[in-house]
Amino acid sequence: MMAKLMITVMMVLLLSLQQGADGRSKRWRKNQMAASSIMRNLITARVDPPRFCNHKICYEDSECSQWCTAGCNSITSKCDTL
């Protein structure tokens, strides 16, 4: 888990360094938005999944599968959380 976090933080830093010549290019702005989205997901992924995700089959719903911090349970196909 720690290695995954380190890789993601490094990716966010690299995305933020890819600015255009003037620092305001469209590509730079897109990268900044993507980086902040990744960081927001990292921060929120540490809490419990939304209540509706507990009853869904996580393989069928990509929105819920990102909340499965311990992966999908192979028997019930529901979210396992740490």
Curated annotation (Swiss-Prot):
Cellular component annotations (GO), alphabetically ordered: extracellular region
Major subcellular location class: secreted
Family annotation (InterPro entries): Toxin_Pg
Record localization: Secreted
Modified sites of kind 4-carboxyglutamate: 60, 63
Record key words, sorted: Disulfide bond, Gamma-carboxyglutamic acid, Hydroxylation, Secreted, Signal, Toxin
Cysteines engaged in disulfide bonds, as pairs: 53-68, 58-72, 64-79
Tissue specificity field: Expressed by the venom duct.
Propeptide section residues: 24-46
Single GO term (MF): toxin activity
Signal peptide range: 1-23
List of residues that carry 4-hydroxyproline: 49-50
Family that this chain belongs to: Belongs to the Pg turripeptide superfamily.
Free-text note regarding domains: The cysteine framework is IX (C-C-C-C-C-C).
Official protein name in the record: Turripeptide Gsp9.1
Organism, scientific name: Gemmula speciosa
